[in-house]
Amino acid sequence: MKLNEVKEFVKELRGLSQEELAKRENELKKELFDLRFQAAAGQLEQTARLKEVKKQIARIKTVQSEVK
């Protein structure tokens, strides 16, 4: 993700409720699990997606802690 995309993503996250943030986090965790499984099986072609999903999860957790 480029800087502008990251800023838009975080801006979008800040507009969501705690429940929506938790739902989005769970979806990304499921995707991360699937990506790790594909990587272990040697089927993952977009290895950078692992890093991107981890960062998105961290951003969601940061926004959640800002609200608390």
Swiss-Prot record:
Highest taxon above the source species: Bacteria
The name this protein goes by in its record: Large ribosomal subunit protein uL29
Organism the protein comes from: Streptococcus sanguinis (strain SK36)
Cross-referenced HAMAP family: Ribosomal_uL29 (MF_00374)
Keywords assigned: Ribonucleoprotein, Ribosomal protein
Gene responsible for this protein: rpmC
Entries under InterPro entries matching the protein: Ribosomal_protein_uL29, Ribosomal_uL29, Ribosomal_uL29_CS, Ribosomal_uL29_sf
GO biological process, alphabetically ordered: translation
Family: Belongs to the universal ribosomal protein uL29 family.
Any Pfam family: Ribosomal_L29
Sample GO molecular function, one term: structural constituent of ribosome
A GO cellular component entry from the record: cytosolic large ribosomal subunit
CDD domains: Ribosomal_L29_HIP (cd00427)
